A protein has these predicted regions:
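N-terminal intrinsically disordered, low-complexity tails of helicases
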Residues: 1-65
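Amphipathic alpha-helical protein-protein interaction surfaces
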Residues: 34, 94, 123, 184-187, ...
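Conserved nucleic-acid-binding Ia/Ib motif block in the N-terminal RecA-like helicase ATPase lobe
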Residues: 37-48, 93-162, 170-173
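Hydrophobic beta-strand scaffold positions of dinucleotide-using enzymes
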Residues: 54, 69, 150-153, 177
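Walker A/P-loop NTP-binding motif
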Residues: 55-67, 78-93, 99, 109, ...
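Conserved alpha-helical segment in the helical subdomain of ABC-type ATPase nucleotide-binding domains
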Residues: 60-61, 142, 166
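The conserved Walker
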Residues: 71-75
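SF2 helicase catalytic motif II
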Residues: 158-200
């Protein structure tokens, strides 16, 4: 089968702007270099053909490139970043290896649920949601027991970093979901604080 996926960039040192989703032809997930159990789980979940944003971004992200992408709600963008971040996890290490920042608690909870669904093919992947509006101490206790992926809002993530309960020394993936909305909501300083705490 001839690949309909976009070519990969030559330079992995800079963020790649993926092509507009409407310019990418949908392709099956088995064109991606994903393990068989992951592909089987995607089929069980009803993922057959990649959406345009998935086809545009997954090959780039799975190859280890940073990227900047834009897509509408309901376009499948969560899977577009969840699959690559899950592939980079070391399940044997319960240090935080992936961090997803979202503008609201509601979106963070939705993202967490979708990542959990996609992670079913992996063994013992722990995903935590850290948002305001709930007590911080139970969240800190959960972090102390270890987690692979953290999804949260900027302010609460900043709180945990400043308290020392969220350590990002082992972080491999940082996702800003709806970054434009977070900036519109005045989270620039919070995002900058969290980003500064991430490994270079």
């Amino acid at each position: 089968m001839t690949s309909t996926l976009p070519p990969l960039p030559d330079d992995a040192s800079a963020a790649t702007f993926v092509p507009p989703p409407e310019a990418v032809v949908a392709a099956p997930f088995d064109q991606l270099a994903l393990p068989a159990p992951v592909l089987a789980n995607l089929t069980r979940l009803g993922y057959h053909l990649m959406t345009p944003i998935q086809a545009a971004s997954l090959p780039v992200a799975l190859a280890g490139h940073d990227l900047i992408a834009q897509a509408k709600t309901g376009s499948g963008k969560t899977a577009a970043f969840a699959l690559p971040l899950l592939q980079r996890l070391d399940a044997r290490s319960f240090a935080v290896q992936a961090l997803v920042m979202c503008p609201t608690r509601e979106l963070a909870e939705q993202v967490t649920q979708e990542i959990r669904r996609i992670a079913r093919a992996e063994d013992n992947i722990k995903i935590l949601t850290l948002c305001g509006g709930t007590p911080i101490r139970p969240q800190a206790d959960s972090l102390a027991h270890g987690a692979h992926v953290v999804v949260g809002t900027p302010g609460r993530l900043m709180d945990h970093i400043s308290r020392g309960s969220l350590k990002l020394d082992s972080l491999a993936t940082l996702v800003l979901d709806e970054a434009d909305r977070m900036l519109d909501m005045g989270f620039f300083d919070d995002i900058a604080y969290v980003a500064k705490a991430c490994p270079k």
